[in-house]
Every structure is written in structure tokens, then in C-alpha cells.
């Protein structure tokens, strides 16, 4: 009886591991073979190097950016969906009610443009072609590939089709992540109210009282400073945003070439996995 129990447990474990292994492999990108997709004008070979970086060879820029959107969605779809939701203030659709405050905050700072068509119409024709092709590549992958990455299946969420406005919102989200003025303005206003202009200026010497007028648009009906700061802090933690970028310059008098040296080290959250950058060769 004991042997039968042991054998039964082993069988259950083996079957469980096999099922889990199969479940985890669903949605893993397949970089081999060939595909026939709508939207391309000609054949586009895509070679992956040992690091998995795609090398896209296309006859036109439109085809190149279509393929870029397709391969990026193939490799990073959940990360892209998360950023799309953050830019639109719809994180609660993915992560539940706990994100409602963050969504309200994101919508308050208006990352998504109110009139994206007006902005898009002012872009040069070449940029329009690139953006449209990139969007079409993403959406083609979403529509054609039924096997979603495990994150979607665990959360019971399906990716949305992309628009140009989504891209604009993500660009503004990236800019907001790299700035700290929002938080500093609110903190300074609190200090100014409690300590007075002169003492507050000692702590923030680069601020001027005239800059306080920028906060008038919030109005009395909006959340208080403390709540706004808390919401911004919560969101930065969720997005993995931390300060620390730095720049420095060396005088030409101290360089071998006799010319000044300028260095920049933007800390664009490179410690996160997956990282903020997607390497590709077009």
C-alpha cells in the first residue's frame, strides 16, 4: 500500500510538472520559420543574433517599422500593454481596483493628448509613415497570435489594439518619469505655507514665489497637496522610477584633444526587467 501511495504521488508530481512546463511555454516567442502577414509590401527577413536582438532587413522604411512593431510585440507585449495602460490612466483594468487612485492621478496630469489627430497632422510625412507602420505591426501581432504571454493569462486580461495616441501618451509618461518638478512644486508650496517665503527659499533656493502661480489651475476642489504627493510617489514606485541621472563636463584645458568633453548618464530605469529599451537593428 505504501509503495502504491509513493508511486501515485510521483505520478501526480510528474504530471503536474509537465503541465506547468507546458503552460509556461505557451506564449513564448517563436523566432524560427517564416510567417505570412498582411501589411507588408515585400518580404522582410528578420535575423536574431545570439542575444536575441532582431536584425530587420526591409526594402522600405514602412516595412521596417511594421516589422519592428511586430517583433517588439512578439518579445515585450505585456510590458507594452502595461505602459499603454499607464499612459492612458487605465492600470485598474489590468491590476484591479487598487490602481484606481493611480489612474485618477494619471488622467489628472493628462498624459494622453486631448486631440491626438491635430498633433499627428503636424508631423512630417516620413514620421507619419513610421508611426502608422509601427502601430500596424503591433496590432497585426495582437490579432494574429492567439497564444498570449503568461502574464495576460494569470491576470485574465487581453491586450488592446494600439493607436497613435497610445504612443504619444507613453512618450509623455517617459518624460514625466524623468522629471521631479511636479513633486518639488507641491512640497515647496507646503513649506512656503508653513514656514513663509524666506525660510522656504533657504531650503529651495532655486525657487521663486512667482512660480507658485503654476499651481492655481488645480483649484480648491482638487485633492490636497499631501494626497497628490502620495499619489505621485505611489506611481513612481509602481513604475520603478528613481532619480539619479547626472551630467558632467571636462574643460578642453584638461583633455588630451584640447576640446571639452561632455558626458551624460541618464538613469532610465535600466535595473528593471524587462528594461526600458528594446534593441533592434533596422
Where would I find each of the regions flagged by the language model?
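Glycine-rich phosphate-binding loop of nucleotide-binding enzymes
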Residues: 282
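Positively charged n-region of N-terminal signal peptides that target proteins for export
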Residues: 1-5
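Substrate-recognition/specificity elements adjacent to catalytic centers across diverse enzyme folds
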Residues: 20-261, 266-277
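Hydrophobic membrane-insertion alpha-helices, especially the h-region
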Residues: 6-20
Amino acid at each position: 500500500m505504501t509503495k502504491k501511495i509513493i508511486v501515485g504521488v510521483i505520478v501526480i508530481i510528474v504530471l503536474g510538472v509537465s503541465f506547468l512546463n507546458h503552460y509556461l511555454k505557451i506564449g513564448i516567442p517563436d523566432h524560427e520559420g517564416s510567417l505570412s502577414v498582411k501589411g507588408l509590401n515585400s518580404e522582410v527577413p528578420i535575423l536574431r543574433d545570439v542575444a536575441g536582438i532582431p536584425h530587420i532587413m526591409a526594402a522600405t522604411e514602412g516595412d521596417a517599422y511594421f516589422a519592428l512593431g511586430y517583433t517588439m510585440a512578439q518579445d515585450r507585449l505585456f510590458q507594452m500593454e502595461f505602459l499603454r495602460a499607464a499612459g492612458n490612466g487605465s492600470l485598474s483594468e489590468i491590476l484591479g481596483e487598487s490602481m484606481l487612485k493611480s489612474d485618477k492621478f494619471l488622467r489628472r496630469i493628462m498624459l494622453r493628448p486631448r486631440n491626438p489627430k491635430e498633433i499627428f497632422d503636424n508631423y512630417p510625412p516620413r514620421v507619419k509613415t513610421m508611426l502608422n507602420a509601427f502601430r500596424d505591426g503591433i496590432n497585426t501581432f495582437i490579432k494574429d497570435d492567439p497564444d498570449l504571454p503568461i502574464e495576460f493569462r494569470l491576470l485574465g486580461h487581453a491586450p488592446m489594439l494600439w493607436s497613435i495616441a497610445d504612443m504619444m501618451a507613453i512618450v509623455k509618461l517617459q518624460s514625466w518619469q524623468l522629471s521631479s518638478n511636479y513633486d518639488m512644486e507641491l512640497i515647496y508650496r507646503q513649506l512656503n505655507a508653513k514656514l513663509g517665503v524666506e525660510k522656504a527659499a533657504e531650503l529651495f533656493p532655486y525657487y521663486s514665489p512667482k512660480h507658485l502661480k503654476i499651481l492655481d489651475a488645480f483649484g480648491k476642489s482638487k485633492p490636497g497637496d499631501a494626497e497628490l504627493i502620495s499619489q505621485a510617489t505611489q506611481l513612481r514606485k509602481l513604475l520603478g522610477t528613481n532619480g539619479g541621472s547626472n551630467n558632467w563636463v571636462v574643460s578642453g584645458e584638461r583633455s588630451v584633444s584640447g576640446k571639452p568633453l561632455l558626458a551624460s548618464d541618464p538613469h532610465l530605469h535600466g535595473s528593471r526587467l524587462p528594461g526600458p529599451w528594446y534593441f533592434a537593428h533596422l
